[in-house]
């Protein structure tokens, strides 16, 4: 069945590529957040353990939305660790132990990187590729990451 949504294949393909890069970033951030949930230590253990859980649960929802947006545009979502590792713009957290404060700082840096990428890619998606729907979707994701970044910054003050 052909897709007929007033977006040519030449408009949709680059947008699907943007979504798959974003999906790789979301997966990387999800895994890092989950890692920190498992490995946080210190006086704030209980609070941060729950905080990281809340964040990775939201990231799980966001990953699903990104993948489904790619499918809605008749594309395919990346689905392997190799694809995610090759496409992500974030750095993985290594197994080395880091302080709770460093965990928060790393997550904040990643959310801020995603926000910067989303801001640029939302504009590109709308202006260059004519996809107002995905532009709006990316702005919504940016707002979710801005809220998570704000919460991380609040812990670091």
Predicted stretch roles:
Residues 6-14, 29-54, 121-133:
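Helix-loop segments that flank and shape redox-cofactor active sites
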Residues 1-22, 96, 100, 104:
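Disorder-to-helix initiation segments
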Residues 75, 131-135, 154:
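Short conserved catalytic/interaction loops centered on acidic-Pro-aromatic/His motifs
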Residues 44-83:
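Conserved alpha-helical segments that form or flank metal/cofactor-binding pockets of metalloenzymes
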Residues 68, 82-140:
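Acidic/histidine-rich alpha-helical segments that form the ligand environment
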Residues 13-23, 27, 53-56, 60, ...:
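Short amphipathic alpha-helical segments with heptad-repeat character
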Residues 23, 30, 37, 56, ...:
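A structural signal for well-ordered alpha-helices, especially hydrophobic packing surfaces
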Residues 2, 45, 57, 77-85, ...:
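Long, contiguous binding/interaction regions
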């Amino acid at each position: 069945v052909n897709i007929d949504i007033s977006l040519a294949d030449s408009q949709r393909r680059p947008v699907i590529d943007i979504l798959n890069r974003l999906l790789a970033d979301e997966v990387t951030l999800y895994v890092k957040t989950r890692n920190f949930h498992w490995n946080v230590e210190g006086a704030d253990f209980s609070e941060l353990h729950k905080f990281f859980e809340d964040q990775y649960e939201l990231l799980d929802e966001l990953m699903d939305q990104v993948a489904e947006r790619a499918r809605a545009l008749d594309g395919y979502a990346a689905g392997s660790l190799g694809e995610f590792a090759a496409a992500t713009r974030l750095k993985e957290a290594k197994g080395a132990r880091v302080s709770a404060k460093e965990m928060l700082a790393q997550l904040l840096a990643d959310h801020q990187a995603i926000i910067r990428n989303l801001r640029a890619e939302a504009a590109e998606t709308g202006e260059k590729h004519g996809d107002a729907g995905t532009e709006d979707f990316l702005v919504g994701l940016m707002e979710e990451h801005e809220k998570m970044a704000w919460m991380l910054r609040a812990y670091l003050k």
